């Protein structure tokens, strides 16, 4: 008897309020990284699909931009309530597609919802300013307006939170939006789009086109897309920034990271170990705010390494849907193999392997265990490169200043953390570290939605960051009106 073939569902693009098939004949499998099960197929869409979506967005923008700001805000409040209603379903979709455990997925959903809540404050955010007397009988006012059709290119590692940095604010401020999500996590995006429609967002205001290079290039080249928001790797981010800038678009490109954490002798050791283990190994290290390097003062180093090793070895690895699991898989086989190659490179270059994640590789999914290196130096590949996996390097230092100097040598400058009870050390750290987001006695210094996600150096290309007031400026343009009203006689 022959084998039974189970047909896998093909995901569609979301354009002008409808799910429609892509014009492509090329599809890619979407795989549950914990089980290697094919859960659907995603289209590698074409520039023609981008063109269709942009036309729909452009048409919708003409009406949506004229909708009263409080009305747009109420729709965003509706959306927030629907996301709250379906939080558990959203979290499960994230775990199935991405692999992170359910607790982390629920946290991501909550951060996405918080971004929607911030965007729902559009009436306050869009307010301009004025000066009633700049000369005799002359006043001036500054107004904000949406910029048009904008595009977002999002990664696989935060399939809800990162898109929610982008489209809720953009559409709340009156723009129309085209999202290219990661082709590895399409099901979560389907749910986000359906809930937007349920919330009352008109057809064409929000559109989704799945794909790879052709879709990205179609967005970067299209003259009717006025701005591009990107989150992803450094090489792709550089390309997006250059290409979009050449085509005279606004661009914000949030790229790679190599986040350093400094642990001083006076730190609460157990607290530091718990937070650093979560920051380094949570989400399988696949996040731009992961702790990648720890510089620890010599007086506490032996105890720190021993406790961190024990903590890493105690972490439960497995399918994120299962109770008690902390560490899920990396996203794909090639990511696992790339991580193994970095571990081998670290050993080859002379680092000491304290905890070897290769010993916990599983055939069931794309799993690799927590990995810790000691005796790492700044000329080693594992210190320089963004590995994007549960791999942590430890360097012993004499003092805070040496730890800061090491961190500042990195080409990346997304985040940095300090564990200490010394307020003077905190101030010195804040004033001398080259990084855009700092954490004191915490492992992941990602800010709330109302502050900018403010990476420095090769972690960000652009002027206006995602989130906070920067995002309002990014998605709006200003119009200044100077008016003269000659004073009549009221005598």
Curated annotation (Swiss-Prot):
<comment type="similarity">
    <text>Belongs to the aldehyde dehydrogenase family. IolA subfamily.</text>
</comment>
<feature type="binding site">
    <location>
        <position position="183"/>
    </location>
    <ligand>
        <name>NAD(+)</name>
    </ligand>
</feature>
<dbReference type="GO" id="GO:0019310">
    <property type="term" value="P:inositol catabolic process"/>
</dbReference>
<dbReference type="GO" id="GO:0006210">
    <property type="term" value="P:thymine catabolic process"/>
</dbReference>
<dbReference type="InterPro" id="IPR023510">
    <property type="entry name" value="MSDH_GmP_bac"/>
</dbReference>
<feature type="active site" description="Nucleophile">
    <location>
        <position position="288"/>
    </location>
</feature>
<feature type="binding site">
    <location>
        <position position="154"/>
    </location>
    <ligand>
        <name>NAD(+)</name>
    </ligand>
</feature>
<feature type="binding site">
    <location>
        <position position="386"/>
    </location>
    <ligand>
        <name>NAD(+)</name>
    </ligand>
</feature>
<protein>
    <recommendedName>
        <fullName>Malonate-semialdehyde dehydrogenase 1</fullName>
        <ecNumber>1.2.1.27</ecNumber>
    </recommendedName>
</protein>
<feature type="binding site">
    <location>
        <position position="156"/>
    </location>
    <ligand>
        <name>NAD(+)</name>
    </ligand>
</feature>
<dbReference type="InterPro" id="IPR010061">
    <property type="entry name" value="MeMal-semiAld_DH"/>
</dbReference>
<dbReference type="GO" id="GO:0018478">
    <property type="term" value="F:malonate-semialdehyde dehydrogenase (acetylating) activity"/>
</dbReference>
<dbReference type="Pfam" id="PF00171">
    <property type="entry name" value="Aldedh"/>
</dbReference>
<keyword id="KW-0560">Oxidoreductase</keyword>
<feature type="binding site">
    <location>
        <position position="180"/>
    </location>
    <ligand>
        <name>NAD(+)</name>
    </ligand>
</feature>
<feature type="binding site">
    <location>
        <position position="255"/>
    </location>
    <ligand>
        <name>NAD(+)</name>
    </ligand>
</feature>
<feature type="binding site">
    <location>
        <position position="184"/>
    </location>
    <ligand>
        <name>NAD(+)</name>
    </ligand>
</feature>
<dbReference type="InterPro" id="IPR016161">
    <property type="entry name" value="Ald_DH/histidinol_DH"/>
</dbReference>
<dbReference type="GO" id="GO:0004491">
    <property type="term" value="F:methylmalonate-semialdehyde dehydrogenase (acylating, NAD) activity"/>
</dbReference>
<dbReference type="InterPro" id="IPR016160">
    <property type="entry name" value="Ald_DH_CS_CYS"/>
</dbReference>
<dbReference type="InterPro" id="IPR016163">
    <property type="entry name" value="Ald_DH_C"/>
</dbReference>
<dbReference type="GO" id="GO:0006574">
    <property type="term" value="P:valine catabolic process"/>
</dbReference>
<feature type="binding site">
    <location>
        <position position="233"/>
    </location>
    <ligand>
        <name>NAD(+)</name>
    </ligand>
</feature>
<keyword id="KW-0520">NAD</keyword>
<dbReference type="InterPro" id="IPR016162">
    <property type="entry name" value="Ald_DH_N"/>
</dbReference>
<dbReference type="InterPro" id="IPR015590">
    <property type="entry name" value="Aldehyde_DH_dom"/>
</dbReference>
<comment type="function">
    <text>Catalyzes the oxidation of malonate semialdehyde (MSA) and methylmalonate semialdehyde (MMSA) into acetyl-CoA and propanoyl-CoA, respectively. Is involved in a myo-inositol catabolic pathway. Bicarbonate, and not CO2, is the end-product of the enzymatic reaction.</text>
</comment>
<comment type="subunit">
    <text>Homotetramer.</text>
</comment>
<comment type="pathway">
    <text>Polyol metabolism; myo-inositol degradation into acetyl-CoA; acetyl-CoA from myo-inositol: step 7/7.</text>
</comment>
């Amino acid at each position: 008897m022959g084998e039974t073939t189970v047909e896998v569902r093909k995901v569609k693009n979301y354009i002008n309020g409808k799910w429609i098939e892509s014009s492509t004949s090329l599809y890619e499998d979407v795989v549950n990284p914990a089980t290697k099960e094919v859960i659907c197929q995603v289209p590698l869409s074409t520039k023609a699909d981008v063109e269709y979506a942009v036309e729909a967005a452009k048409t919708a923008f003409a009406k949506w931009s004229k909708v009263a700001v409080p009305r747009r805000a109420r729709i965003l409040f509706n959306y927030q309530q629907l996301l709250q209603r379906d939080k558990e379903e959203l979290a499960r979709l994230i775990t199935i597609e991405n692999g992170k455990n359910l607790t982390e997925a629920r946290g991501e959903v909550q951060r996405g919802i918080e971004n929607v809540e911030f965007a729902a404050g559009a009436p306050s955010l869009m307010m301009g300013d004025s000066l009633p007397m700049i000369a005799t009988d002359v006043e001036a006012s500054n107004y904000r307006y949406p910029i048009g059709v904008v595009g977002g290119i999002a990664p696989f590692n935060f399939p809800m939170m990162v898109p929610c940095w982008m489209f809720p604010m953009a559409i709340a401020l009156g723009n129309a939006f085209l999202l290219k999500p990661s082709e590895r996590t399409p099901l979560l995006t389907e749910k986000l789009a359906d809930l937007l429609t349920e919330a009352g967002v008109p057809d064409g205001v929000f559109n989704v086109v799945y794909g790879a290079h052709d879709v990205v290039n179609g967005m970067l080249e299209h003259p009717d897309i006025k701005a591009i928001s990107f989150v992803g790797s450094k090489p792709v981010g550089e390309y997006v920034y250059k290409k979009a800038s050449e085509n005279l678009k606004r661009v914000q490109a949030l790229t790679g990271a190599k986040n350093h954490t400094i642990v001083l002798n006076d730190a609460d050791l157990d607290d530091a170990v718990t937070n650093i283990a979560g920051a380094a190994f949570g989400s399988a290290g696949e996040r731009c705010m992961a702790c990648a390097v720890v510089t620890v003062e010599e007086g506490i180093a032996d105890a720190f390494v021993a406790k961190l090793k024990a903590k890493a070895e105690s972490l439960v690895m497995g399918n994120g849907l299962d109770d008690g699991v902390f560490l899920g898989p990396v996203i794909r086989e090639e990511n696992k193999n790339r991580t193994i190659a970095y571990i081998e490179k670290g050993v080859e270059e002379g680092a000491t392997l304290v905890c070897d994640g290769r010993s916990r590789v599983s055939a069931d999914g794309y799993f690799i265990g927590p990995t810790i290196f000691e005796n790492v130096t700044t000329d080693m590949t594992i210190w320089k490169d963004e590995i994007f996996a549960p791999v942590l390097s430890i360097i012993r230092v004499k003092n805070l200043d040496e730890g800061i100097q090491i961190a500042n040598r990195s080409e990346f400058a997304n985040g940095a953390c300090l564990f200490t009870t010394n307020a003077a050390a905190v101030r010195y750290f804040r004033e001398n570290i080259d990084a855009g987001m700092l954490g004191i006695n915490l492992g992941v210094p990602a800010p709330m939605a109302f502050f900018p996600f403010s990476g420095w150096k090769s972690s960000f290309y652009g002027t206006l960051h995602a989130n906070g007031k920067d995002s309002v400026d990014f998605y709006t343009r200003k119009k200044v009106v100077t008016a003269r009203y000659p004073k009549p006689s009221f005598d």
